[in-house]
Amino acid sequence: MPNIVLFSGSSHQDLSQRVADRLGLELGKVVTKKFSNQETSVEIGESVRGEDVYIIQSGCGEINDNLMELLIMINACKIASSSRVTAVIPCFPYARQDKKDKSRAPISAKLVANMLSVAGADHIITMDLHASQIQGFFDIPVDNLYAEPAVLQWIRENITEWRNCIIVSPDAGGAKRVTSIADRLNVEFALIHKERKKANEVDRMVLVGDVKDRVAILVDDMADTCGTICHAADKLLSAGATKVYAILTHGIFSGPAISRINSAAFEAVVVTNTIPQEDKMKHCSKIQVIDISMILAEAIRRTHNGESVSYLFSHVPL
């Protein structure tokens, strides 16, 4: 593809390389380093004048450092006269801080949106935003892609009893997500209502729906410490489910997450590779990964060529 340059940040170079390979491109030359006072330095190693630039950087790992690196890369390309700069952020940072849910709470997702715009981003590509209203925090185009087509494909190919499954949301907020998947599989859905007093602490769960003698598939956009989904798995098994799977777009898996998954009765915990999972897979055999590089690559190709991206909302590109 002419007049396009693809750069990778430090957060997820494996995913960036997969995207580049699918597009038939070489990753652009960029050198990032830290000064002795921990300031981030970025040097773009090739001309971007008049080019359509895409920078892939996920909101994971050292999130604050990686966010700052992304902002500097965007700005460096912008002031080097690139025609357009698109930030490809598979897992959007600070997405859970999307509303003022208590006195004096910041809306940090809006702040991140402002920072990306001020840095010079012309367009954002992301996946399964924790709160879809974050798109409205921007005054530039935002394409929020969905892992759902890839999830449906994985279910059909890997769960032999998928016609006897029930799709379960671990909280009321995910009801729209699970009903969409259930409708497309032509199966039923259920949800778990949770009462939470503190972040990452689940106090009480109420199952709404009948899971008896069915394969239960928990679906959510992300899991952090995994307290919710592990409690949900116990709830589903006690309610008569024959097997329990969890499918998540963003597997953050911090703190006690891995030990909780190992102790829980999951057949598998399936995540996409919006966040690197290689190290976690070494400590947990239940984790399986869906590659979404083809979705990002096709979104980049369509954006560059001025084509519609909405096809990707319902199809997995080859």
Swiss-Prot record:
Q: Which SMART domains has this protein been placed in?
A: Pribosyltran_N
Q: Which domain of life is it from?
A: Eukaryota
Q: Which residues are noted in the entry as ATP-binding?
A: R96, Q97, D98, K99, K100, D101, H130
Question: PROSITE patterns this protein is in?
Answer: PRPP_SYNTHASE (PS00114)
Give a GO cellular-component term.
cytosol
Q: What are the binding positions for Mg(2+) in this chain? A: D128, H130, D139, D143
User: Pathway, per Swiss-Prot/TrEMBL?
Assistant: Metabolic intermediate biosynthesis; 5-phospho-alpha-D-ribose 1-diphosphate biosynthesis; 5-phospho-alpha-D-ribose 1-diphosphate from D-ribose 5-phosphate (route I): step 1/1
What Gene Ontology biological process does one annotation of this record name? pentose-phosphate shunt
Q: Give, as one word, the top-level EC class.
A: transferase
EC code: 2.7.6.1
Q: What is the activity regulation comment for this entry?
A: Activated by magnesium and inorganic phosphate. Competitively or non-competitively inhibited by ADP, 2,3-bisphosphoglyceride or GDP.
Q: Which reaction does it catalyse?
A: D-ribose 5-phosphate + ATP = 5-phospho-alpha-D-ribose 1-diphosphate + AMP + H(+)
Question: Which cysteines bridge via disulfide bonds?
Answer: none
Necessary cofactors: Mg(2+)
Q: Example GO molecular function term?
A: kinase activity
Region annotated Binding of phosphoribosylpyrophosphate sits at: 212-227
List the keywords (alphabetical): ATP-binding, Kinase, Magnesium, Metal-binding, Nucleotide biosynthesis, Nucleotide-binding, Transferase
User: Do you know which HAMAP family this protein is assigned to?
Assistant: RibP_PPkinase_B
Protein purpose: Catalyzes the synthesis of phosphoribosylpyrophosphate (PRPP) that is essential for nucleotide synthesis.
Record note on quaternary structure: Homodimer. The active form is probably a hexamer composed of 3 homodimers.
Record-stated family: Belongs to the ribose-phosphate pyrophosphokinase family.
NCBIfam families from the UniProt entry: PRK01259.1, ribP_PPkin
Q: What is this protein called?
A: Ribose-phosphate pyrophosphokinase 2
Q: What species does this protein belong to?
A: Mus musculus
Tell me the organism's taxonomic lineage: Eukaryota, Metazoa, Chordata, Craniata, Vertebrata
Gene designation: Prps2
